[in-house]
Each structure stands twice: as structure tokens, then as C-alpha cells.
Amino acid sequence: MSAEIICVGTELLLGDILNSNSQFLGTELAKLGIPHYYQTVVGDNLERLKQVIKIAISRASILIFTGGLGPTPDDLTTQAIAEFFQTPLEENPEILADITEKFAQIGRKMATNNRKQALIPVGADVLPNPSGTAPGIIWQPQEGVTILTFPGVPSEMKQMWQQTAIPFLKSQGWGKELIYSRMMRFRGIGESALAEKVAHLLELANPTVAPYAGLGEARLRITAKAKSLTDAMALIEPVSQEILTLTGDDYYGADQDTLPSVVGQQLRQVAQTVSVAESCTGGGLGEMLTQIPGSSEYFLGGIIAYDNRVKNALLGVNQQDLDQFGAVSEPVAKQMALGVKEKIGSDWGISITGIAGPGGGTDTKPVGLVYIGIADPNGQVEGFEYRLGTRRDRLAIRYLSACNALDQLRRKLLIKI
């Protein structure tokens, strides 16, 4: 027995709004231990809606609809469900009274077309909407098929799910097991290389291990099905520990961890501070660091040294090196890092200089060439070269450059913790 999520609305197909409902419902189904293998998005078309229902009941026993419950002619979800199961609609007086009262509370008269929202299939139960005028239904139109409908407004859908849908599903025997996942995050290793390292773990059945790729990082999702969170964690933990052994310092965090949050935790642990000198990222590294609440404990500030004159005047970069090696070079990156550390008085100094594109590249210094400098508390400076590729756009190169700088600092801080 599994569920299928069906999101209704032409605006979803056109990309006018983000389909956050499917993400929420997918997470909630996992918490209840209800497997779901398909999510469908369909426009506001009666025949296509009925076609989707036909396909869905062939592969799922719980159909969860969002959207298409409004008062306008293109709100067709309830009508499509009723027609498919050849069941008439009837006006529910309690729903109609509730809608009328909600309009009265805001000093408005209910429009005639709102009566449409009081129509539900004969035999269906009402799924109340405390916040809006579009109630849903809970209906078992035939053996082995359960239908739940929700409005497309995320806040209304979530409230209805928590208050009514979860108790109903638990009453049907769901919720005795749960599906829990841990997302492990890695930098400095690609998805394919990571998959090779943990190849034997990808064959596990419970928990399962699956690789994913992100911009500049790779991930492994470990998913367990168990009767309790404690049991699920007991399945996940030994696999997680084995992955840590196999991947070493490439692992940087799990679940909601980010590079800025992890680096911030490290700096707090060692009671040290950092400052940044940026060229091609234009403040992006400082912005990342200050995303974290309380970052003023360890981030002192930065200098955006875009022009060579600023690199020389504020960071003390040697003019001869600028002339000989160019602004995008390891010697300049190292001097920028040491310069900002000394200028601001932080324990650590980080610098970034590179060619973000789309122009400015040459055969010897192509777009995507980036140098990072790290100055440590002892005044020792190390430089790192990255070639991020000529096909990436400017935003991606800038973002990856800032991430790589943070990752190099993270790795150095690991030695101190």
C-alpha cells in the first residue's frame, strides 16, 4: 500500500509558483511510514485530471490532492473525482454555513460562486479548513482507495493535514512505522567518486544509501524504516560511522548543516576569529559567514579589494608581484590573506581572487581560475588553486569560490579541534 501526491494547477506547470506542497507532504508521509513512489502535477483540465486519477489508482491506494478546490470555473478537482467514480455531488449545508460565516466575519457578502466549494461527493467526509473557504474531503470511493483533498494554499493545507489528516491516517493503521533519513554532506569529492568509495553500502536494503550531487558538494542519504525514531537511528548510526571512516575530512556535516554554520561552530570551539579579503566574489564570502546568527563572535570584517590599487593600499600586496604575476595569482592571494589578517587583527585571514567571467579569461588564465589564500594564527600562509571551468556562469563561479575558501578553512580548523 502506497500513496501518490497529485498537485493540481496550471500555474505549477508554468512555473509561476514553487510547488512546496509536494515537498511538505513527502516529508510527512515518511514520518508516518507511508511509502510513496510517484508525484504528479496536472493542469486545470477536467479530462486530464480524470486520466491522472485512473493512472494513480493503478499504482497507489492513497491519493492526496492539493489545489483545485476554489470557487472559479478552473477549480475542477472535486468535480473530476466525483465524475471519475460516477458519484453525484451534493451541497453540504454545514460547509455552506461555515463559508458564509467566514465572509461575514470580514464584513463581506459571499459571492454566488463560493457555493461551489460546499459541493462534495455523496458519501465523502468533510476535511475542515479552519483558515480558508476551501474544505477538503476524506473519501473511500471503492475498496482499496482512499482520497484526501486539500486546498493549494500551503498554510491552509498544512493546518488541515496536522489537525485532521494525520489522525485519520493513524486510525487506519498508519503511523506504526516511520521512515527517517540522514543526509550526509561532503566537499572535495564528486558524486561518482563518493559512490565508488561506498559502493558496497549502496546495496543495503534497510537502511538504504543513495548518492546525490549538488553545486560543489556531494551527498549521501541514509534512509531507514523502523517502528520508532530510536530504532531508525540504531540502523542508521553504524552505516553513518562506516561512511565517516571511508570519507575522512571530505565529510563536513549532516542534514541542515551548511559550510558557514560548520565553520562558525569550529571557530567558536577554538575561540578564534576570521577576516576576509575578496576580489572576484565581491563580498560573497563575508555574506556567507554573516548568514549565521551570532557570527559577530568570530567574524571581524572584510575588505573588498576589487581594484589592484586597493589590494596594494589596504592589503599591502606588493606592486611588483601584481605587475609580474597579475591580480589572479597565488602570490597575490597569499598576500591578500596575510594583509587582511594583519589589518583587521583576526586570528585567520582568507582571501579570494579569480576570474568569474564571462569575459576576462585568457589561454593561460581562463575563466574559472581562482586562487584562495589562508593565513593562520602563526602568520603562515598557504595558497590554493581552483579551476572551476569555463562553462560555468559568473554566479556559480563566485559561489563555488566562496565555498571553497570556507572549506579550506574548515579543513585547517579540523586539525586544531
From Swiss-Prot:
SMART domains: MoCF_biosynth. Gene3D superfamilies: 3.30.70.2860, CinA-like, MoaB/Mog-like domain. InterPro entries: CinA (IPR050101), CinA-like_C (IPR036653), CinA_C (IPR008136), CinA_KH (IPR041424), Competence-induced_CinA (IPR008135), MoaB/Mog-like_dom_sf (IPR036425), MoaB/Mog_dom (IPR001453). CDD domains: cinA. Belongs to the CinA family. This is CinA-like protein.
